[in-house]
Amino acid sequence: MQNSTTEFLKPRQIDVNTFSATRAKVSMQPFERGFGHTLGNALRRILLSSMNGFAPTEVAIAGVLHEYSTVGGVQEDVVDILLNIKGIVFKLHGRSQVQLVLKKSGSGVVSAGDIELPHDVEILNPGHVICHLADNGQIEMEIKVEQGRGYQSVSGRQVVRDENRQIGAIQLDASFSPISRVSFEVEPARVEQRTDLDKLVLDIETDGSIDPEEAVRSAARILIDQMSIFADLQGTPVEEVEEKSPPIDPVLLHPVDDLELTVRSANCLKAEDIYYIGDLIQRTETELLKTPNLGRKSLNEIKEVLASKGLTLGSKLEAWPPVGLEKP
């Protein structure tokens, strides 16, 4: 049984200092020396890379075929409009994707709040500007919003080809992470006479689609889930797979006599222990020309006969000769 000198301390004091709906500091203590940096770095990396969120992944603007177009009566070009759409913070409830519609005309600002929303979709920054319209300007678009994790480029994301997809729909690189910024500090902590302990302080800022405190809980659950496999570490037995020899073309198992060569050529081959077609095709022209009494004329005869069967000299065969093959 472990005594007090070998048992690990666990954090007993957790404080949450909330600055706003999107920013909070979470402090935990005490940790054994070094564990503040170990866990702080792990949680920070998970928070930045592995949290689920929502982002626009596809936009179709009426009259626009590609991102380098312009829209009449709209101050911004399409590239700027798409960048502004990426800045909208969405939150979906009970669904993983949604198709949204935006229609507006007349002079003024087009903002995220102008997007038509179903009851289970929120926009957390409705004042976010998408574009500006002139007196005769109008804009109509569809925006596809999906749930995902981390950052996904268009090339790295599996895009399902939909025959009903609107022509001119523009795919977007998507940053799903709801974490805007996260940092951590490790401060000294003290328990009774021990002064070599750590206090971990996490400073988290989100886009508002997730509470900072909930983000820390989610990151901790991910870390525990990933590390739990090591708590019950067992080697996986490796099944021995019997190596099977590659199949051999039956033609190669035929004796060279089946090639109907001249008696002179056939005898020269047998003198070199070449009994099967499989033996023959592994020899090179140079090797055969070194065979006593086999000249260029006989070599050309052999090449022509092999070519008629789709075979050539100098071929490589694995597992030759096959088990059980005897001299005829």
UniProtKB/Swiss-Prot annotation:
Organism classification = Bacteria, Pseudomonadati, Pseudomonadota, Betaproteobacteria, Neisseriales
The family database entries (NCBIfam families) matched by this protein are listed as: PRK05182.1-2 (NF003513), PRK05182.2-5 (NF003519), rpoA (TIGR02027)
Q: Among its keywords, does the record have Transferase?
A: yes
Q: Which GO terms describe its molecular function?
A: DNA binding; DNA-directed RNA polymerase activity; protein dimerization activity
Q: What the protein does?
A: DNA-dependent RNA polymerase catalyzes the transcription of DNA into RNA using the four ribonucleoside triphosphates as substrates.
A GO cellular component annotation in the UniProt record: cytoplasm
State which Enzyme Commission number(s) the record gives: 2.7.7.6
**Catalytic activity line of the entry:** RNA(n) + a ribonucleoside 5'-triphosphate = RNA(n+1) + diphosphate
The segment annotated Alpha C-terminal domain (alpha-CTD) runs over 248-328
Recorded source organism is Neisseria gonorrhoeae (strain ATCC 700825 / FA 1090)
State the name under which the record lists this protein: DNA-directed RNA polymerase subunit alpha
Family, similarity comment: Belongs to the RNA polymerase alpha chain family.
- Region: Alpha N-terminal domain (alpha-NTD), residue numbers: 1-234
* Lineage top rank: taxon: Bacteria
What Pfam families is this protein classified in?
Answer: RNA_pol_A_bac, RNA_pol_A_CTD, RNA_pol_L
Query: Which InterPro entries does this UniProt record tie to the protein?
Result: DNA-dir_RNA_pol_insert, DNA-dir_RNA_pol_RpoA/D/Rpb3, DNA-dir_RpoA, RBP11-like, RNAP_asu_C, RNApol_insert_sf
Assembly and interaction partners: Homodimer. The RNAP catalytic core consists of 2 alpha, 1 beta, 1 beta' and 1 omega subunit. When a sigma factor is associated with the core the holoenzyme is formed, which can initiate transcription.
